[in-house]
Structures are given as C-alpha cells and as structure tokens.
Amino acid sequence: MLVLGIESSCDETGVALYDTDAGLRAHALYSQIAMHRDYGGVVPELASRDHIRRVIPLLEDVLAEAGVGRADIDAIAYTKGPGLAGALLVGASVANALGFALGKPLVGVHHLEGHLLSPLLEADRPAFPFLALLVSGGHTQLMRVDAVGQYTLLGETLDDAAGEAFDKTAKLLGLGYPGGPAVSRLAEFGNPGAFELPRPMLHSGNFDFSFAGLKTAVLTQVRKLNLDGGEACEQPRADLARAFVDAIVDVLVAKTLRAAREHGLKRIVVAGGVGANRQLRERLNAEGGKRGLRVYYPDLQFCTDNGAMIAFAGAMRLQADPGQVQSGYGYGVTPRWDLEDIRIRQA
C-alpha cells in the first residue's frame, strides 16, 4: 500500500510517500523559519499562505523522486489536527481534492501520533509496549503506548510546553528565532552550576510538568544582571542558558525514568523537536542504560514536523483498522484534539 502524507499544521510544509512493503519512498519538506524570523514567531496567516504556495510543488517532487504517478497512490493521509486552523485547512483541502479526483481513501492523522510513531520509521525500531516522551513547541506529554491507536496519557504540562519554554527563554536572552536551537547552542559554552534554577514539579509525585516558573526564574536573572546587551554579557548569558537547559533536562529525564519504572516499561521513545536536543539524548541514554532501558529516537530530520511521519502514521492506522478511512470528502480539521480521542478499538 502506497500512502501519500501531507503535513501543514504549523510552519513546515511536508509531503512524503510511504510504502507498507518497501518503506519510505520519498519525502520533501519546506520550512518557513526564514519568513517568520523577522516577526520573532509564527504568523498564522503568513504560514497558511505559504503552505498554499509550497504543497503542490512538493507533491510533484516526491512523485518524481519515487518514480510514481498520482494514480499509483493507494491512500492519502493528512494532518487533521492539532495545529493552526488555517494551516491545517490547506493540507486538508489538498488531500481531499486529490482523494476526490483520484477516487482514493483518506485518513486524517493526529499530528502528535505522527511524532509518537516516527521512531518506528527507523531500522532499529521499538516493539510495543513502550513509554513515549513527546516534547515539542506546543506539547510535553508522557504516554503509554500499547499499540497503534492504544495511547494512555500519564502526564502533561500544566502551562508552558518544554519547547515553548525554550523559545521564550531565547527571547529573554536576546537570541534569534527559532529559539530552541539557539538556546541549546549557547548552552554548549556555558559553565555548569554558574546559576541555580528551579526544577519545577520534580518531586510532585505525578508525571505532570510545569515550565512557566522556570521561564520566570530566567527573567529574574536577566533583569538582575542586565544580561540582554553588550559583549561583556556573553559568558553570563551562556551560563544562564546552560542552567536553563540543565533544569529542563533534569525534569524530563527524572519523570520519564520514573514513569518507565512504575509502569514496567523497558523501552522509551522520545519524539518532537526538543527530542533533538543533544543533552537530553545523552542523559536519557546514560541514565536509561544504567537501568536496563532502551531509548529510541527518530532520525534528526524527522524530529521536527514532516510529511514522512504523517504518511507512516496513516499507513499504520489503516493497517490496524481499515475502518479508519474517512467517510466522504470534506474540509473539517480539529485544531484542538486530544491524542486519547483517536483510540482504535481492539477486536
């Protein structure tokens, strides 16, 4: 089964072809980072308009790379939510128009399910069940994954997501957009222990997160030391960035390992943009290894939003339950959507 995947939930336009027999056949991605940089963040209207410009050329690129025609597509998967409503509608419109014109079935994919299953694209893929840590700009969640469509939420952020905290801290430190990679790069030059920042909810007794207070603690230090200007501030800024990253990583690692232990899970999947962070990967690998745990990640190119994960997730859902096919053609999207709402009933 050859599945076309279309991703347009935020500021990346992704298109891919996944073959259930041959694996990933082709994928193409266009990032809008340069366009949004001048605004310091994603402008929804601009994002939607750019998706319109990019999606069809990307579709033609992946068809050419795979050496197939539109008629060879067996099914079409698209990101139905969550995300920016206007951006989602672009991908949904293209998918539904193609499906109608070609007479192909469609499946609306949950964006987070795409991230969660993306490590299964790798040759060294985890078996079910596993614990998933989803860390991105909009979400920070711990999920128990028993099968495709079998997800149990164990904990989530009560305020800022980890990626959001990275972006806001980047602004406080006078760094560019996107903030997450900028903070991580600066932290590489920081001295550990130069600043002491809180580890919110580290000992809360549950698996929820909170990062708003950490951002406020960074703001307090920035104002106290006037770290937002001048070359003389470079080392203190790097030290503060290091303290921030250390605090985030400490909380994510501690809660992830405790969740794995309490739920008897030996495999951990880390997905989402923050999952590309070097410190997080190194700490989880080291601490997990001491406890006999295996940690799996998607390839770095698939940590951020992409069409490959949507094509793959759509294919997996159709294989798990052919009844997942969308009834008719339409343009409905779900900007706010809980992952547990897409549960596949077991026979």
Curated annotation (Swiss-Prot):
GO biological process: tRNA threonylcarbamoyladenosine modification
Annotated GO MF terms: iron ion binding; N(6)-L-threonylcarbamoyladenine synthase activity
Superkingdom to which the source organism belongs: Bacteria
Subcellular location, principal: cytoplasm
Residues the entry annotates as binding substrate: 134-138, 167, 180, 277
Keyword Manganese: no
Localisation: Cytoplasm
EC identifiers of the protein: 2.3.1.234
Binding site for Fe cation: 111, 115, 305
Co-factor(s): Fe(2+)
Gene Ontology terms: cellular component: cytoplasm
Catalysed transformations (reactions): L-threonylcarbamoyladenylate + adenosine(37) in tRNA = N(6)-L-threonylcarbamoyladenosine(37) in tRNA + AMP + H(+)
SUPFAM superfamilies, per the entry: Actin-like ATPase domain
Keyword tags: Acyltransferase, Cytoplasm, Iron, Metal-binding, Transferase, tRNA processing
Listed InterPro entries: ATPase_NBD, Gcp-like_dom, KAE1/TsaD, TsaD
Note accompanying the cofactor annotation: Binds 1 Fe(2+) ion per subunit.
Similarity comment text for this entry: Belongs to the KAE1 / TsaD family.
NCBIfam families: gcp_kae1, T6A_TsaD_YgjD
Stated role: Required for the formation of a threonylcarbamoyl group on adenosine at position 37 (t(6)A37) in tRNAs that read codons beginning with adenine. Is involved in the transfer of the threonylcarbamoyl moiety of threonylcarbamoyl-AMP (TC-AMP) to the N6 group of A37, together with TsaE and TsaB. TsaD likely plays a direct catalytic role in this reaction.
Protein name as annotated: tRNA N6-adenosine threonylcarbamoyltransferase
Protein encoded by which gene: tsaD
